[in-house]
């Protein structure tokens, strides 16, 4: 991982570099084609590792973002039904205290629960120019879903 001020370091080195108050995690969209129970189990193991290495940090599990309606309708794997199912499963990893689940989709979705066309140019990924909006939303408390 390349980290500003640290250069290229391992994930272990990042976790050892300081005590974090908050850790935001979004994983799993690329694993939708694999058995979900296995992916969720690995996700849980990753969260357990974070808890062990950063016991005082609040971990925020972010929902995976939806894809556009067109992509969802045409893709047997990367569609919003599968994304929602996966998000429901990872939400169960949260305990509501030190591990919290936050759904970022309302920030980028259209009125029908799909990634709005204006936020993407590939039907899947939010454009980089919206990352600051995303970060600001999380920092502001994500409408009460993430405590300051």
PLM feature spans:
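Active-site segments of SGNH/GDSL-like serine hydrolases
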Residues: 26-30, 48-84
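Catalytic His-Asp segment of secreted/periplasmic serine-dependent ester chemistry enzymes
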Residues: 66-148
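Generic structural signal for well-ordered alpha-helices
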Residues: 43-48, 87, 91
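Loop/turn elements at helix/coil->beta-strand transitions in domains of secreted/extracellular proteins
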Residues: 18-23, 54-59, 96-100
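A generic secondary-structure signal
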Residues: 13-14, 45-50, 137, 141
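Low-complexity, flexible helical/coil segments
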Residues: 5-11, 57-64, 136-142
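Conserved SGNH/GDSL esterase-like catalytic core that processes O-acyl groups on lipids
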Residues: 1-45
């Amino acid at each position: 991982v390349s980290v500003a001020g640290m250069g290229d370091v391992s994930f272990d080195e990042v976790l050892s570099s300081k005590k974090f108050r908050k850790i935001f995690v979004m994983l799993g969209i690329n694993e939708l084609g694999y058995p979900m129970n296995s992916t969720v189990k690995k996700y849980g193991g990753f969260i357990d590792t974070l808890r062990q290495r950063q016991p005082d940090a609040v971990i925020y599990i972010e929902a995976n973002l939806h894809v556009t309606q067109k992509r969802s309708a045409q893709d047997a794997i990367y569609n919003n039904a599968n994304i929602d199912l996966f998000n429901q499963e990872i939400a169960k990893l949260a305990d509501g205290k030190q591990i919290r689940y936050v759904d970022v989709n309302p920030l980028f979705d259209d009125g029908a629960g799909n990634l709005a066309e204006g936020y993407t140019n590939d039907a899947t990924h939010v454009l980089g120019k919206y990352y600051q909006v995303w970060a600001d939303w999380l920092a502001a408390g994500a409408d009460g879903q993430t405590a300051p």
